[in-house]
From Swiss-Prot:
It comes from the Bacteria. Transmembrane segments: none annotated. Its EC number is 2.3.2.6. HAMAP family: Leu_Phe_trans. This is Leucyl/phenylalanyl-tRNA--protein transferase. Pfam families: Leu_Phe_trans. It is an enzyme of class 2 (transferase). It catalyses: N-terminal L-lysyl-[protein] + L-leucyl-tRNA(Leu) = N-terminal L-leucyl-L-lysyl-[protein] + tRNA(Leu) + H(+); N-terminal L-arginyl-[protein] + L-leucyl-tRNA(Leu) = N-terminal L-leucyl-L-arginyl-[protein] + tRNA(Leu) + H(+); L-phenylalanyl-tRNA(Phe) + an N-terminal L-alpha-aminoacyl-[protein] = an N-terminal L-phenylalanyl-L-alpha-aminoacyl-[protein] + tRNA(Phe).
């Protein structure tokens, strides 16, 4: 059975998460609370919340884990062309932390194939907004003609970024935000973005799965490192427009 966590109960070891033969592989625990302290502790252990309205808070640590290594990010010819256009045209902007809650609300409202409703509830928005105020959550936003047209948000501790969700109101707007994030993280030597679960979209951009054991080991090392700055703009995209193939293989375990 999945353990129920009281306010003072610690998370069980991630190895106790439900396995692939169950109906909920990766489910580790449930609780009634989503306190900022609980949320921080979860991320530092490689755990994340995912649940719907009417459910308790469900905590997950899947095996394998989907990640994106910044140096393995795939820039297709069409995306490269888009990034060059964004760099040339002053109507396009990349803003960081300009409208964090707005990005979360837009992600909540974005239609998802095969998904009814959203897991980004008002409770989730409030909890992650608390992390944003403490400097541990960030939004990367694509703007065009003064209007926010796409973006993503996630959690950052030390040298680790945990991606949460993205949306696009116009073609490639979320990819522009992700490309800007990747370029910024590469510039500062971050080796991994947590993508939580496998999707064909992430795989097309260079995402891949690694064993949970390797993921958690990397998280423990990375979150102990000094944090990186979170001020940048669209000029970081220039680093991605010179090639279409990923860089040499990283040291992240396969």
């Amino acid at each position: 059975m999945v353990p129920w966590l009281g306010p003072d109960d610690p998370f069980p070891p991630v190895e106790r998460a439900l396995g692939p033969a169950t109906g909920a592989p990766g489910l580790l625990a449930a609780s009634a609370d989503l306190l900022p302290s609980r949320l921080i502790d979860a991320y530092l252990r490689g755990i994340f919340p995912w649940y719907s309205d009417g459910q308790p808070v469900l905590w997950w640590s899947p095996d394998p884990r989907m990640i994106l290594v910044p140096d393995e990010f795939k820039v297709s010819p069409s995306l490269k062309k888009t990034l060059k256009r964004v760099l040339r045209d002053p109507a396009w902007e990349v803003r960081v932390d300009h409208d964090f809650r707005g990005v979360m609300r837009a992600c909540a409202q974005a239609p998802r194939r095969g998904q009814r409703g959203t897991w980004i509830t008002a409770e989730i928005i409030d909890a992650y907004s608390s992390l944003y105020r403490s400097g541990n959550a960030h939004s990367i936003e694509t703007w065009h003609d003064g209007r926010r047209v796409g973006g993503l948000y996630g959690v950052a501790f030390g040298q680790m970024f945990f991606g949460e969700s993205m949306y696009a109101d116009v073609t490639d707007a979320s990819k522009i935000a992700l490309a800007a994030l990747v370029a910024h993280l590469r510039e500062h030597g971050l080796e991994m973005i947590d993508c939580q679960q496998n999707t064909s979209h992430l795989a097309s951009l260079g995402g891949r799965e690694i064993a949970r054991k390797a993921f958690v080991a990397h998280v423990r090392r990375a979150v102990a490192e000094p944090p990186i700055p979170w001020q940048f703009d669209k000029r970081v995209l220039a680093a991605l427009t010179g090639r279409t193939e990923p860089a040499a293989p990283s040291g992240i375990e396969r």
